[in-house]
């Protein structure tokens, strides 16, 4: 009986661990402020490359996950100048279908885009 209880506990821990191992790779979108029905976001590819979704002046190029931080690098395209940047965001929550990032006091809520 004790072995069955121990086995059940171990299997439960394995199942919980598997549920919390959501991948950050993929397409993530959020609503565009002030533009109902429009979305913007980014794609995180498995090779460390990144790209922007519906953001003409913010071109993501690379990403890296370090602990609970997401580093997004790219180029900000402005009038007659391009500026390289790296955004450091704290990963507050990651599930199979949602990603919540924090930059300072700002919370950014993304949904996985499966299209």
Locate each region found by the language model:
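Sec-dependent bacterial lipoprotein signal peptides
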Residues: 1-19
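Lipid interaction determinants
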Residues: 17-115
């Amino acid at each position: 009986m004790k072995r069955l209880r121990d086995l059940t506990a171990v299997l439960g821990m394995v199942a919980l661990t598997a549920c919390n191992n959501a991948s950050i790779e993929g397409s993530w979108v959020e609503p565009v402020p002030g533009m109902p029905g429009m979305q913007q976001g980014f794609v995180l590819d498995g090779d460390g490359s990144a790209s922007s979704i519906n953001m003409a002046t913010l071109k993501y190029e690379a990403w890296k996950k370090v602990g609970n931080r997401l580093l997004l690098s790219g180029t900000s395209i402005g009038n007659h100048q391009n500026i390289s940047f790296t955004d450091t965001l704290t990963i507050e929550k990651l599930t199979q279908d949602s990603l919540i990032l924090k930059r300072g006091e700002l919370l950014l809520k993304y949904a996985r885009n499966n299209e």
